[in-house]
């Protein structure tokens, strides 16, 4: 009995020693919400430290209301801080918002400011938008067909070249009009698509500028017919209006409207 008691004591010592050793706990993976909160705090810290990427991201979050309370003023403030550090996406965001006039009131002077800073970094999109700003004018920006054509020329895509042809044919200021050049550019663009309604419209305006109203009328009719194959272009009323002017031997004068 004595030996059994000793054995029992030894067993209990072993059991107790096992219970007293550290117990490894199960690791609970963080929730999606906690991960997002952690990332948000990290972004906020980096933004306050002056990191342009973090400032831009936090600004977008404030504008959209994603992960934070929606606050347009605060969002623009963060994006502006990033833009001042030459963060080109932040600059484009401010420029596009000021140009579009949807989330904030349209301000072409502010849009011009940021697009010009983007131009300094070699951005082609900024040249394209500046072309529209200078061709339309307003909101503190003086309309200038010459500057508009310069910007569209640097952008260099087919749409921009078509806009140059349109300005050459229709600009209200006579010193910027050149019907012959507008015809040449439009015919060149038509080589890629003989039924492009916009290019045909440009060509008709160019013929009218030269005083060749017969060619203008024929070409404008082709443009109107081409619209039927391009239902996404909802401008039939404008096309018909121009046709009537050409039928009355009148050239068309217009600035490029803002998009």
What do the predicted segments below correspond to?
Residues 45-48, 80-84, 116-120, 150-157, ...:
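Conserved structural position within tetratricopeptide repeats
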Residues 57-64, 95-100, 129-136, 164-171, ...:
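Hydrophobic face of amphipathic alpha-helices that form TPR/SEL1-like repeat modules
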Residues 32-38, 69-78, 104-114, 138-151, ...:
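Structural signature of tandem alpha-helical TPR/SEL1-like repeats
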Residues 2, 19-63, 259:
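N-terminal leader/linker segments that initiate helical-solenoid repeat arrays
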Residues 64-66, 100-102, 117, 136-138, ...:
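Register position in tetratricopeptide repeats
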Residues 48-52, 64-66, 85-88, 100-102, ...:
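Short helix-capping/linker turns of helical repeat alpha-solenoids
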Residues 163, 170-180, 189-197, 201-259:
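Terminal, low-structured helical/coil segments at or just beyond the last alpha-helical repeat
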